[in-house]
Design a protein with these regions (language model features):
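Charged, amphipathic alpha-helical regulatory modules used
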Residues: 2-130
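Conserved catalytic cores of very large enzyme subunits
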Residues: 122-522
Length: 524
């Protein structure tokens, strides 16, 4: 009780009575009005700046600020002090006592003018969006009302991010073109791209939208549920959303559908070979309808963000008969396209990435027919993308050494390894890397040619200039980690609470900071 009383007493203390100037002094405001100087108002203002900087002043620090401000006002030897001069005095006092608050005060003191400019920019952009549209992102249809609303909000969010998250140096680097901060309209809210662990979410059932979903018992239900999971979870992030090794995810549900169909035909007294053939045909049909359903859903149903999520699936390494059937059927559906008869064309989503292993897909190998289906699809549609697991480079090295597949997040972003026990570095020779269930918190691009030109123009070492911008990016990412770490698991329940992300079995009220340790942040 005593500590609370002392705290309340300190908050209510009037420093204006304790620290007074030598004479009666007035502060001249921007509108020309005058107000009697009272240092207590300074304490109130800097207290708000300290709060924005996530800190607070001690009683001694407040007294230091008061004494400094009153002394400087006395030194002016005037009866009226313009508000800009008063701001400079207060800022100088904060630099002496707590520099981090000085920056917060400096950034915020002209907030009225900044907000007028900011809202004017947002208004101009909103008018353009409402009557002309927006062509910045091909994934968003700016003709739709829901998308227009989302784009206007994004413009406001971008302005707020630039004003209150980026430092002066970072803003200048962006304006000069040396760095580019991707997705400024969304970075304050959530993460970028991911390899979502759909299998982990499905296993044993899960909760979505306050409704409990049992684990699917058939393939057609699995397709429906996975489609719902993908659209719901992808709406809570802004980057590419990948379902890795989808053939292996669907395989056990195809097995369940097959057993169910086989039992049905056996009950009808059908011959064993006919029952097996018909059961396989039923499963094939479920695969066809399921993949067609995904193509329609992912290309026509916009997310709650107002865009069509960049959804990717990878497949091709499953050797079981139903895993093979999954990959081949998916490629056939993409090759045939969607639309009116005689006017069908391939859709965009989900983007398909074929995982090629020369020991599985080469001539005479177990998955040669899967490879041929991929080649035929590529010849007609330019899909799928091909990712070699046994060639050269980082992805192949991880596959050869650990047997782990590094699927792309979206189209081109690959996760660096995170080891089960060692974290960033393997604990020993038996430590295994984890990729599925991990994500990236944001990307910042470097303009290397411009940095080289700057180094030459200023006769400086290229790496010295490069290090300056790399350090800017590092500090930006560090602040992003700290900021996102304060978010609650309720912001993306499927990822943080139902197992979509690595370690994602938090309570809704838990902070997500523990999950960020395996997340990456990218300079491109």
């Amino acid at each position: 009780m005593s500590s609370n009383f002392e705290h309340d007493h300190e908050e209510n203390e009037d420093y204006g009575k304790q620290f007074r100037p030598d004479r009666e002094i007035y502060v001249v405001k921007k509108d020309g009005s005058k107000e009697l100087f009272n240092v207590q108002k300074v304490i109130s203002a800097v207290g708000k700046s300290a709060y924005r900087a996530l800190t607070k002043f001690t009683k001694e620090e407040k007294e230091q600020i008061c004494q400094y401000v009153v002394d400087k006002v006395n030194e002016l030897e005037v009866d009226e002090v313009p508000i800009p001069i008063m701001h400079n005095i207060v800022e100088s006092a904060l630099e002496q006592v707590k520099p981090i608050v000085a920056k917060s005060y400096r950034d915020y003191r002209n907030y009225k003018q900044d907000f007028v400019r900011m809202l004017d920019d947002v208004y101009k952009k909103s008018q353009s969006i409402m009557y002309i549209g927006d062509k910045e992102n091909a994934n968003t249809d700016s003709a739709l009302v829901s998308t227009k609303r989302s784009l206007i909000f994004n413009q406001l969010n971008k302005e707020l991010y630039q004003k209150f998250f980026l430092t002066t140096e970072e803003i200048q680097a962006c304006r000069d073109g040396y760095i580019y901060v991707h997705d400024m309209s969304a970075r304050r809210d959530t993460m970028n791209c991911c390899l979502f662990d759909v299998q982990n979410v499905l296993t044993g059932g899960f909760e979505m939208g306050n409704i409990w979903y049992n684990e699917p018992k058939t393939l057609d239900v699995a397709f429906d549920v996975i489609g719902d999971i993908v659209l719901s979870a992808a709406s809570q992030q802004y980057g590419g959303f990948t379902v890795p090794s989808v053939d292996l995810i669907l395989e056990p549900y195809a097995e369940k559908s097959y057993n169910r169909a086989l039992a049905k035909y056996e009950r009808l007294g059908v011959a064993a070979d006919v029952a097996e053939r018909e059961a396989l045909a039923d499963v094939k049909k479920e695969f066809e309808q399921g993949f067609q359903g995904w193509e329609y859903k992912f290309n026509t149903v916009a997310s709650s963000r107002g865009d069509y999520p960049f959804i990717t699936v990878t497949a091709g390494t499953g050797t079981g008969k139903f895993a093979k059937m999954a990959t081949i059927t998916m490629l056939e559906v993409r090759r045939k396209g969607q639309g009116k008869k005689d006017h069908k064309k391939p859709v965009l989503f989900p983007k398909i990435v074929f995982l090629y292993d020369e020991n599985l897909h080469g001539p005479g190998k177990p998955l040669e027919d899967v490879f041929e289906a991929g080649v035929e699809c590529s010849a007609k549609t330019m899909y799928p993308d091909w990712l070699s697991l046994t060639g050269k480079g980082y992805v192949a090295s991880m596959y050869k050494q650990y047997g782990k597949i590094v699927s792309p997040m979206g189209c081109r972003a690959f996760l660096s390894p995170w080891y089960e026990r060692g974290g960033m570095h393997p604990a020993d020779d038996k430590d295994q890397p984890v990729f599925v269930g991990r994500f990236n918190i944001g990307a910042v691009s470097l303009h290397l040619p411009m940095i080289l030109a700057k180094a030459r123009k200023e006769s400086r070492d290229f790496y010295e200039v490069l290090d300056y911008y790399l350090e800017l990016i590092r500090q930006l990412h560090i602040r992003t980690y700290a900021y996102l770490g304060e978010m609650r698991a309720s912001t993306n329940p499927l990822a943080y609470c139902e197992g979509g992300f690595l370690g994602g079995h938090l309570k809704l009220t838990d902070k997500i900071k523990p999950l960020l340790k395996s997340a990456t942040a990218s300079p491109w």
